[in-house]
Amino acid sequence: MVKIRIRSPLWYDGVDNAPHRSYLKAIGFTEEDFSKPIVGVLASWSELGPCNYHTLELAKYVKEGIKEAGGVGLAAPTIVVNDGINMGTPGMRYSLISRDLIADTIEAQFNAHGVDAWVGIGGCDKTQPGIMMAMVRLDIPAVYLYGGTAEAGWLGERELTIEDTFEAVGAYLAGRITLEDLKRIEELSFPSYGTCQGLFTANTMAMIGEALGLSLLGSASPPATSSRRRAFAIASGRAVLKAAELGITPRKVVTYDALYNAAVTLFATAGSTNAILHLLAIAHEAGVKFTLDDFDEISKKVPVIAALRPAGPYAMQDLDKIGGVPRILKKLYKAGLLRGEALTVEGETIGKLLDRWQPPPLPEAGVLYDVDRPYKPYSGIRILRGNLAPNGAVMKVGAAERLKFEGRAKVYDSEAEAFKAVASGEIKAGDVVVIRYEGPKGAPGMPEMLKITAAIVGAGLGEVVALITDGRFSGATRGIMVGHVSPEAAVGGPIALVQNGDRIVIDGEAGLLKLELGEEELERRRKNWSPPPPKYKGGLLAKYASLVQQADKGAVTSPPVL
């Protein structure tokens, strides 16, 4: 057994630390408590939306598990930026920034106070990768716990998610539904606290937590309102001390094989493209070489086996009813697509856990398919390259009916300009909407584009109009959408050189994103291009723009691990 009071003695043992003990005795510590491991409980709590509304309650259950296992739990908060509420507003510039801030705040709090281990509770999109980045950065025993998905809504026999509300706005603007129809969907689409209900970014990252081995097997799918969510909170508290006893730290878990498994799972479920950014960032923090080239190679081997929204009709709660994420992982493992020797925080390899796990005796009911008879015969996401994205771009082919598209560019230097064009009917079938200067440095913050992509789909243009951007997409995005174009426009990437009327080729099968111009013309335009002035001269956004790397590097702000 490994000594599990690995850091706290420096803070709390000995005569010279008597004042430190006084501080904790003031909040109820006993003398005996100082002989136990001190375990941080990170609650990403906020009332600024439903996603993290309940995490303080979950923290209490985590502390119960820690106490049962012989430790003392101390809760601490971090910030939350609710992506859905900020969509299409200046607030979205703070979304991706918050991921790195969350990792930084966790490092500051838990390193400053010498905790021996910790459990991180995440909910909304960026809290989860931020916590996972901090786990490998601190590299002390840690377990990730997801706050859980919201329940789906219902409109008669129609299952609703927040995706329906975003798309209903586009349908209303196009005259396809009435204002009363829109209001009914608005009222019914999000009936409980928890995260967005499809396999959007939050549920994707929760699934990734299981695939990486950072969270307990089966813990991703129970809804936020489920009693099993509280049971997993208690179990996570126990598990972190077991991991500490076994000497298991996150960098022993987040290896190349674990990242490989996460990528396979992402592609097999057509999960959020944001997960590629986040996995690149997690690998960066772990000091593991895992690049877009790895994603590209893996994507060529994996079909889509899950019919989860937005690629299919089902919500996360439907997956939960038939066994949750382990049912997906076991299919992939039995097909030889997962690397079973990857270690997990539970102290066993993922292969051993999956060998032991048995699905409930329920039919898959169209939610899941077999690898040899997939839902779609190709990967959910493809990496694109070409003269428009020399360093790469991503396309969620699993949520598009067409993998190939050619059209003429309509260029906008902000999402707001492009949204006005959609709302006014300026965008027509055959157009390729190009939205630029929305990348990591240019926006800054690489905002998501759900407001405009949902408007395009809602207007009935989802399969006849394409969109290309150096920004990001929500996990709820569907249609012919290409994002993360790198290099971005603000640093002189080729997307900055596109002009109205230029012909663009998108080929999701071949992995191609091409501007049909000769190199001489591109060079002429490049000589005439000059970078725009920074949008912010002070504050957090200016600091971020000065530090952030490009999307193909995970849009990270911290130096590499040596």
Curated annotation (Swiss-Prot):
The lineage of its organism: Archaea, Thermoproteota, Thermoprotei, Thermoproteales, Thermoproteaceae. The gene is ilvD. Its cofactor is [2Fe-2S] cluster; Mg(2+). Its EC number is 4.2.1.9. It catalyses: (2R)-2,3-dihydroxy-3-methylbutanoate = 3-methyl-2-oxobutanoate + H2O; (2R,3R)-2,3-dihydroxy-3-methylpentanoate = (S)-3-methyl-2-oxopentanoate + H2O. Functions in the biosynthesis of branched-chain amino acids. Catalyzes the dehydration of (2R,3R)-2,3-dihydroxy-3-methylpentanoate (2,3-dihydroxy-3-methylvalerate) into 2-oxo-3-methylpentanoate (2-oxo-3-methylvalerate) and of (2R)-2,3-dihydroxy-3-methylbutanoate (2,3-dihydroxyisovalerate) into 2-oxo-3-methylbutanoate (2-oxoisovalerate), the penultimate precursor to L-isoleucine and L-valine, respectively. Pfam families: ILV_EDD_C (PF24877), ILVD_EDD_N (PF00920). This is Dihydroxy-acid dehydratase. One of its GO terms (molecular function) is 2 iron, 2 sulfur cluster binding. Homodimer. It comes from Pyrobaculum aerophilum (strain ATCC 51768 / DSM 7523 / JCM 9630 / CIP 104966 / NBRC 100827 / IM2).
